[in-house]
Amino acid sequence: RRADVLVEDEKILRVARSISAPEATVIDVEGQLLLPGFIDAHTHFDLDVCSTTTADDFFSGSRSALRGGTTTVVDFACPNKGETLHQGLELWHRKADGSCCCDYGFHMTIDDWNPGIEAEIDDMYAAGISSFKMYMTYPAMMIGDEAMYHALKKLREKGGICGVHCENSGVIDALIAEKKAAGEMGVGSHPRTRPDFLEAEAVSRLLRIAQA
């Protein structure tokens, strides 16, 4: 429908067929579609993983997001192995603060479990983080089954959200070794070292652990 939109302090105050606001600045977009800013809830900016760094940092990635109509990104704060959740969150804030062109938030990666990390979960909630990520592969980030069980149990108590990257790391490593030994190092070998049945096995294992 055709309408005027009154905005103040980044909030929509009113939508009506015709709005009189003499003190307002008028931006004429007649004939255009007016959409709310999109939210990209899965970005990996400035992430060091598998001996490389993702293509975009917070500046270039958020700038591209804005050009496409995305005004909020939710990235994954990833502590280095042995670090606390607080240290991981502080590191990602340093990467984003002053560089990100749009609004941003974080999911928190859990790669281990101990009494300190368990206590930090409450702190993450206090900091506005209620969604978490765990990896069943990638040595620098992966979590073991025992730790994953305890983490899922805690997040269930908190009513949190947990995303899990589901793959069977051990079998993937075995398949990679076989391809290397056969000299099959091309891009085409990548999906063959990560067949779908390994994802299915990991998803099944995750669900059974979560239901324990």
Over which residues does each language-model region extend?
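Histidine-rich, glycine-flanked metal-binding segment
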Residues: R1-P36
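Short Asp/Glu-rich motifs
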Residues: A24, A77, E83-L85, P115-G116, ...
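Receiver (REC) domain switch-region micro-motif
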Residues: V26, I39, F132
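Metal-associated gating/positioning segment near the N- to mid-region
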Residues: V29-S99, G116
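Residues that cap or flank secondary-structure elements
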Residues: T52-T53, T84, D112, I143, ...
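Divalent metal-dependent hydrolysis catalytic cores, especially in the metallo-beta-lactamase
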Residues: F59-E83, D97-D112, A127-A140, G159-G163, ...
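Short, structured secondary-structure boundary patches
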Residues: A77-C78, G88-C102, A151-R156, A182-S189
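Histidine/acidic residue-rich metal-binding segments in metalloenzymes
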Residues: G116-A212
